[in-house]
Amino acid sequence: MMSQVSHSQEGSGRFWNKFKSSTKSLSTSLAHLSIKAEKDGDTVNTTLVHKGLVKFYENQHPFQGFPGWLGEKEDLPNERKILDTQVKHDMKKQNSRHFSPSFSNRRKASSEDPMGTPSSNGNTPEYTPASKSFQDIYNNHTSSSSATPRRASSRPTRPSAGQEFRASLGRSKTSNSFNTSSTPTPPPDASSGVMAMKDRLKRRNNDYGF
């Protein structure tokens, strides 16, 4: 009889030592339970202590699973669902952490400067009206045109019809005067020279009595 009592006390002592070593934050989980409103059930799995232990291991991050001494797995929450929930939560938290800095900075800048006024650090570009841009383009074009010397056109200008007529009339007068002055006097007619020679021969014959 005494050996059975000592054996049971030794077993309970090992249980409580294991309980103390594996439930360092048990008080935090038990704090979420409203002990006044809840009562122990009729079974071991429905006691307040058991519920607190299940809640404690379920909220561990990362989830390590339920210890075997806590009870049968069929009586405990689904470990696979708990792991999937934690993974989804971690991914969502990581994405929001990467997205939030840039989004919050843009949102902060827009809230501080809703009218697009350039900030003091010079990162925000200055807004330029469209009319000013067109005016600058026109001024640049005008200054470049005045600075560049105009090239003389190598293409000859075509004269008008009146100019061509006056030029052709002047050329015809010049050619007529040149022809008049440079044309040689035609020699005397050859037939008239022959007749004069015959007349001289006749007079000479008459003088000599032939």
UniProtKB/Swiss-Prot annotation:
Q: Which residues carry this modification: Phosphoserine?
A: 102
State if Acetylation is listed as a keyword.
yes
A single Pfam family it belongs to is Mso1_Sec1_bdg
Q: Where is this region: Disordered?
A: 88-210
Output compositional bias ranges, type Polar residues: 117-141
Quote the function comment for this protein: Involved in secretion. Component of the secretory vesicle docking complex.
**What's the miscellaneous note?**
Present with 1380 molecules/cell in log phase SD medium.
Quote the protein name from its UniProt record. Answer: Protein MSO1
Q: Give the organism's phylogenetic lineage.
A: Eukaryota, Fungi, Dikarya, Ascomycota, Saccharomycotina
